[in-house]
Structure formats: C-alpha cells, structure tokens
C-alpha cells in the first residue's frame, strides 16, 4: 500500500457539492459551509498532538473562540458536525463551518471563521484554557479503560494510522516526551 501526499494548491479552492433532500425538507436551510486546512503528516506524533491541542483550544466547548463564534452567529443552525481535526489519513486536516445555512451565506461564514482566527492570533487565548485542553488531551491519550475495546487493542488501533503510513508505530505510543514538550511549549 502506498499513500501519496495530498495535492497542494497555490490558492484556496471552492468546491460545491449537492445531496438529495426529501420533499418535506425543502426549507432552504440545508447547506453545509465548511472550510478546511491541510496540516502536517499524521505519523509525526508531536505535530499530531499539537494539532489536537490547537483544535481543542479553538473548538473544545462553547467558551472556545471558534466554537463560540459559530454557535452565536445567525448564519446557520449549528456548527457543522464535520468541525474538528481529522488525523486518520496520511495528512491531517482541520475543518470548521456551519450547517443549516444557505448558499448566500458562504462568504459571511468564511469571513466569520477567518476573522475569529485572526482575533485569536492577535489577542491570544487565556493560558488556563490552553492548559485545561492540554490536561484533557493528556488524560484522553493515557486513558486505560475508557474505550469500548480492551486496552491492548486500543493501543494497536492508536498506532495503526502511523504504521499504515510507514511511520514508527512504537514511537507513536511514546507519549510522555511529546506531552512534556507540549507542556513546555505552552
């Protein structure tokens, strides 16, 4: 199996797709407007956990800046269920947007997301929020009995994405040094 890197684009692209609706659902507010960014390789544990930390800071709960902006705007019914980090492919993607919107709101949703991210860059996020997300991330990564599978199988599944993409599967399980580095980075 050989997985190639995703195609790189020199500028943002817009993709418009359609899905069928039942006649009873024809109210005009069925559009999903999402933006996504291609991030680094999944088999880099530090980059992967950093991306998970960033996604958590932005979208973890209603107090998170991007989640709050999406929940409190009137451009759709709710944040898209696609929001978050996808680290199951060779390269990670970060996705955010709205569901229950209209095509006419596309630019407004994009502007909201970009301006919120720019505000986060300018104003930052409270240190205690970052530390709370890191603590939660650490607990999720080290959790032994919380999943629906036996612990050993959970470890194997955690390392599978890295192994499939020719990364060091055992290194993907060596969380302590990476979590310590993240803690010192923040």
Region spans (language model):
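C-terminal, helix-dominated tail/subdomain
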Residues: 145-178
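Conserved short hydrophobic interaction patches
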Residues: 112, 116-120
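Non-catalytic beta-strand/loop surface segments
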Residues: 1-45, 56-107, 111, 126-154, ...
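Segments forming glycine/polar-rich beta-alpha architectures that bind adenosine-containing cofactors
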Residues: 177-186
């Amino acid at each position: 199996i050989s997985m190639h890197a995703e195609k790189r684009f020199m500028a943002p692209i817009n993709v418009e797709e359609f899905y069928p609706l039942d006649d009873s659902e024809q109210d005009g507010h069925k559009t999903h407007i999402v933006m996504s960014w291609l991030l680094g390789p999944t088999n880099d544990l530090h980059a992967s956990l950093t991306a998970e930390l960033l996604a958590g800071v932005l979208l973890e709960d209603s107090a998170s800046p991007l989640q709050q902006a999406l929940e409190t705007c009137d451009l759709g019914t709710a944040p898209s269920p696609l929001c978050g980090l996808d680290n199951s492919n060779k390269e990670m993607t970060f996705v955010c947007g709205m569901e229950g919107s209209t095509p006419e709101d596309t630019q407004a949703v994009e502007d909201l997301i970009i301006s919120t991210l720019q505000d986060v860059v300018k104003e930052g996020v409270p240190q205690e929020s970052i530390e709370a997300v890191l603590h939660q991330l650490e607990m999720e990564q080290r959790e032994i009995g919380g999943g629906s599978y036996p612990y050993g199988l959970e470890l194997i599944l955690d390392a599978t994405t890295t192994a499939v993409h020719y990364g060091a599967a055992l290194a993907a399980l060596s969380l302590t040094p990476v979590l310590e580095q993240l803690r010192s980075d923040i």
